[in-house]
Structure formats: C-alpha cells, structure tokens
UniProtKB/Swiss-Prot annotation:
Region spans: Disordered: 239-263
Top-level taxon of origin: Eukaryota
SMART domains in UniProt: 14_3_3
Subcellular localization, as worded in the UniProt entry: Nucleus; Cytoplasm
Residues carrying Phosphoserine: S67, S239
Name of the encoding gene: GRF9
UniProt key word Phosphoprotein: yes
Protein name listed in UniProt: 14-3-3-like protein GF14 mu
Amino acid sequence: MGSGKERDTFVYLAKLSEQAERYEEMVESMKSVAKLNVDLTVEERNLLSVGYKNVIGSRRASWRIFSSIEQKEAVKGNDVNVKRIKEYMEKVELELSNICIDIMSVLDEHLIPSASEGESTVFFNKMKGDYYRYLAEFKSGNERKEAADQSLKAYEIATTAAEAKLPPTHPIRLGLALNFSVFYYEIMNAPERACHLAKQAFDEAISELDTLNEESYKDSTLIMQLLRDNLTLWTSDISEEGGDDAHKTNGSAKPGAGGDDAE
C-alpha cells in the first residue's frame, strides 16, 4: 500500500488536470490511487468518475453524430459516404472499447475488492453497469449480448446492495435507479420495465423526502427530476407505440435517445 503523501499527490494532480480539462491525465492520476488498493473517499470516487465520464463522453457524442449522419446518407442512397462513415465509426468504437476495458480492469482488480462499505459497493458496481451499457450501445450480435448481460448483472448487484444499505433518497441509489432504467429502455428495449423501475424509485424517494439532509437535497432532487422527465418521455412513447414490442429495433440500441442518465 502506498503512503498517504503519495495518495495526496495523485489526488491533487487529478484536481489540477480537471481544472485544465485534461481528462486523460485526470484518469491516469486516479487510476494510480485505485491501484493503492484502498477504499476511495467520496471526493476520490467523484474525481475518478468525472475523469472517465469526460474521456468516454466525447467519444459517445461523436459516435452518435456519426450514426445519425450515416442513417441520413443511407436514406439518400449515398453508399460511398456510408462506407466512409462506417470506417470512421470503427475508429471511435475502438477508442470506446479500450476505455471501457480499462475501467473494467480497474474496477474488478482494485476498486470493487477494496470497497469496504455499502456506498462504495453500490457506486462501483453501478459504474461497472454503466460502462458495460456504453459498450452495448454500439456493439452488435454476441458482443452486444455479452455486454448487456454483464451490465444487467452489475446493476443487479448494485441494486441489492443499495436496497440493503442506502435510503431511497440517497443520490447514489437514485442515480443507480435512473441509469438502470435507461438500460432497460435503451439496451433491453423494455420501456414498461424501465418505467416501473423509475416510478418505483421516484415514489419511494418522495415518501421519505422530509428525511433528506441539506447536503444531499440538491443532488437527490435533481436526479428525481431526471427520473420524472424520463417517465414523462417514456410513458408518452408507450402510449404512442403500443408497448414493448414496438420498441424493438433489430437488437440495436439508440444511444442517448432513451432519456437522461446520471453522472
């Protein structure tokens, strides 16, 4: 195990990198903390999460843009341009895959085994579910199924721990419910299951809203608003489309189209 001074240095460098928007370096600093095999503090967890979220977020946004343009070119019959876009998308997909593989190894080898409390266990398994979900957004065939299965498994482990250890109003438990419901909507093409999960989380939190401390109030109510926004979007889709089957799109996801998720 590394010294406290070494750990403090890595955390400080991660904060500097964040200020300068150098997110790849932010991630490297926080990976160094993770490799000390310690249970991360709330601040350290958030630094790790923000770093990876920004590193992968720009690529996910690029992939969505290319996917949208590809569909438009295909409709126009511009096969040459479709081929060019597909080649570019493959480059982005490789970058996305490498980022996801990287965080999975850090989670499986260091962060999840070192998690000593319920909050950390929920946080890191939720994170694992998120990054397998990001893989499932662009993978196809057996690779997509495997990513979806692993995402589901991680979200289920996180949910079991959250229900046992965290109150319904806890921002991490709410963020998990938000992202798990997005997984059901976007990846599993199951809007009714997504709505049930989101509504249950929202209703349970509402019933205990008066127990929220001032520190968590802003975070929790923001996620509750996202849950409600997604519910509004999804229930209108269900009534328009006529249920789950209408949302099945040849086993491929429509990333970002299914609602908001948490950081």
